[in-house]
Amino acid sequence: MQVPGTMPAPVLKGQALWLPLLLMLSPQASGGLVITPPGPELVLNISSTFVLTCSGPAPVVWERLSQEPLQKMARTQDGTFSSTLTLTNVTGLDTGEYFCTYKGSHGLEPDGRKRLYIFVPDPTMGFLPVDPEELFIFLTEITEITIPCRVTDPRLVVTLHEKKVDIPLPIPYDHQRGFSGTFEDKTYVCKTTIGDKEVDSEAYYVYSLQVSSINVSVNAVQTVVRQGENITIMCIVTGNEVVNFEWTYPRMESGRLVEPVTDFLFNVPSHIRSILHIPSAELGDSGTYICNVSESVNDHRDEKSINVTVVESGYVRLLGELDAVQFAELHRSRALQVVFEAYPPPTVVWFKDNRTLGDSSAGEIALSTRNVSETRYVSELTLVRVKVAEAGYYTMRAFHEDAEAQLSFQLQVNVPVRVLELSESHPASGEQTVRCRGRGMPQPHLTWSTCSDLKRCPRELPPTPLGNSSEEESQLETNVTYWPEDQEFEVVSTLRLRRVDQPLSVRCTLHNLLGHDMQEVTVVPHSLPFKVVVISAILALVVLTIISLIILIMLWQKKPRYEIRWKVIESVSSDGHEYIYVDPMQLPYDSTWELPRDQLVLGRTLGSGAFGQVVEATAHGLSHSQATMKVAVKMLKSTARSSEKQALMSELKIMSHLGPHLNVVNLLGACTKGGPIYIITEYCRYGDLVDYLHRNKHTFLQLCSDKRRPPSAELYSNALPAGLPLPSHVSLPGESDGGYMDMSKDESVDYVPMLDMKGGVKYADIESSSYMAPYDNYVPTAPERTCRATLINESPVLSYTDLVGFSYQVANGMEFLASKNCVHRDLAARNVLICEGKLVKICDFGLARDIMRDSNYISKGSTFLPLKWMAPESIFNSLYTTLSDVWSFGILLWEIFTLGGTPYPELPMNEQFYNAIKRGYRMAQPAHASDEIYEIMQKCWEEKFEIRPPFSQLVLLLERLLGEGYKKKYQQVDEEFLRSDHPAVLRSQARLPGFPGLRSPLDTSSVLYTAVQPNEGDNDYIIPLPDPKPEVADGPLESSPSLASSTLNEVNTSSTISCDSPLEPQEEPEPEPEPQPEPQVVPEPPLDSSCPGPRAEAEDSFL
């Protein structure tokens, strides 16, 4: 098809042969190709339309990216051919090379191709996109490559960086091609700044391919020099030691000969350098300097060139202009950049209102000038959190001895509008006036609007604008004032309403470029009916009542409820992350635990909490060997709710289910009929472990101090060490002085009557317990004396062995609970009680603790949790297992070896505590703990609970740290306890037929279901119990001293051992004083206040 007005195009077969002939015969061939508008570069505005025309003596065509875009070809009357390319709605992607060539020539002829480069600055596109394969650049040692990070705006300053390195590389940059040079095997990123935003290019990866060739690099000390300065160019060759240098430079043909200097770089192998030095350069020395290197062995050649410019004098040239007015938003940071070229390096000074600016000490103004290339500089003014006072006239001046340049602009600080005042008044004229005043920059616009049929203007409904109202209804007056000292405009507008018949909402709205602000006021008639006032008052009272009820309901829901912390596991999922707990209310209750209320005489309150209290009492008939026994009774307060009564009954059933153990506060009996529920447990006269450690800390520290003396001075039996005075009772501020536990007393009643008792009520003043006095002065009464063969030593001195012994006993008790699949959930030193002879027992006295005032418990919803003692899985996933108790045991160890310290003393109980636990933070080694003890703590604090040691393993680990005497004494006391007529042992025997065949507490196998026949209608209940195993997995039976802790294989009533409930009194003569034993010679311990390491020969306490 032939285009009208054009000649038929030659056929493609002979087109390449006819084209030179046409060029020679054409009368305009000498003119060649002509591009309109001429190049070589054009900068187009984004979204504009542009027309390119190419003409020549033969058919021409436009090409881009090896393709021919859509274009229009024509032939004029004088025989000239032309092609028109229309670029419509240009974007940054239109940036690139455009070629005009003769159709079918493919650029074969020298004059048959002409190039034009077009830039389309696009603020959203810093760098032109590249194909993925262009991101990987392969080179040889002699190959110069180009990193093609091309920009859409030639005015942008582009720097090349190694990835994650802020220092730019001194590589020449071409806006049309990118960075060209020799690169190392690294990852490179191009950077530029568009406005206030720094833009990074894609990462380019350079890989070198090793070839046996020479590699040449050329660099100059300066590529720009002034006339009369020296030119020094270095040509460096790597990879070969026998090369020939040939230089080509501008004035070589005119007869100026320069002898280069060649030397070896001895500190770098295979590096040869040739230096071309031209002193006193002249203008004619400007041009290209070429270093040609050759070697004759493999006939390898390589050459590199560099351009050097000689200027007559120095210069300073600004690149690009800033708008005359620059804007900054109030309290936002603003950076202003000026780009310029200069040689030699200039001095840069910034001025504000003709006053020199310096770096502000407060960091509010930052000035910096950086050299991005040899002669290009960027000077930046940064205003941090712009203030109104920083508006003004700014000037940047760059100068040196030869030239100077400066750029000035005005900075305007835009301030968001704000309505400062909206008020109404009632002038004497009868009108109602509304006045609105506001400020902002740039000048705000004020509009008035009303909602005539509503009391206020809803945001979703457009109000009625004022301004078109008639003169009879309203009158508007607006004044605008500029305040130079505040650099902002103030608008004051007055609206006069001539008649208001009903309440009317009037809105004043201010807006400018940064947003808008509004306020509303309700205009009421002069004579507002009394009915409206009454209705408003009633509505306000109703709203206040509803709000008060909501607050009361929320407070009632947040009130903590008592719940038993101990849980019995019924089954475990296959992955070990889901546990099903036994419902305690479904456990049977054996009536053999019942004790008639008339056999119990209540005394004073030992501890009182938010839900209940613990009372000292005397029980009659609990033991065959003792007519009376001092006990502790747990009960609820009279204000207890039904759910709390149910929780106390659950605690009773769990305690009766567990059975007796030496290191657990054992159940002795209960009163559940004919009155409130009483749980009767063992009485521990020395209170909780925290308070015990605080009271006896001075004896421990004194003992450690004495151990630094020669061993001959250290005699420790049942008496105090030499030089240590008898400890007098010292009451520390905020601590109890040997009390049952550290609890607040919220009642002033010292003696608790038996409530709701059938028959006669007994009130008795129980003999004042000596636990309130220093226990070293305590002398047991005749009924309380115990057989010395089974009593534990009652030395008042606290030793390192005692600390390890406490830990060992708690581990034994927790091993027993774990064998019963019981999870404690609140294991802490405050829930460990101290009995005669430093025997410890695990308990849970949350009932009698005011947890709402106890700083150890943190409110979480409607409950209080001991977060500092809880394992991570319990805090974050509410997962409680025996292994989460292991974590708490590690915290308890830290308490013991800090002598009663509070865990995590350096962490506040807020988000910082939770974050520290998630990051794996653990407490440091206590001062009094040995490395072995701290290693046990760290094992207990493993992040994954599956790899924490079980309590059976913890017993073995702690057992190794104790002397043989201690372990034998403990085993003897445990066996005596199990052979005694202790009420807990006797009732467990009566409750379980076939008593000698009870399971070992070390049996931690999976849960089976064994039928138990209770006395009162519970025959259908199946209670979960561990199944028996013939042997223990951890080793021979006799290897664990805790084996006998709950084994009831020998039954007799020869003696009774209970916590503070001694045996039947026996008549025995007063012991004669024994001669003082000879002191043993022991190595002197290290001078460490912690007294680490148990020393059996120096410790005769406990056990």
Curated annotation (Swiss-Prot):
Family: Belongs to the protein kinase superfamily. Tyr protein kinase family. CSF-1/PDGF receptor subfamily.
Modification Phosphotyrosine, positions: 562, 579, 581, 686, 716, 740, 751, 763, 771, 775, 778, 857, 934, 970, 1009, 1021
Organism: Canis lupus familiaris (Dog)
Keyword Aminoacyl-tRNA synthetase: no
Glycan attachment sites: 45, 89, 215, 230, 292, 307, 354, 371, 468, 479
Domain Protein kinase per the UniProt entry, residue ranges: 600-962
Signal peptide: 1-31
Taxonomic lineage: Eukaryota, Metazoa, Chordata, Craniata, Vertebrata
Gene Ontology terms for molecular function: ATP binding; GTPase activator activity; phospholipase C activator activity; platelet-derived growth factor beta-receptor activity; platelet-derived growth factor binding
Record-given protein name: Platelet-derived growth factor receptor beta
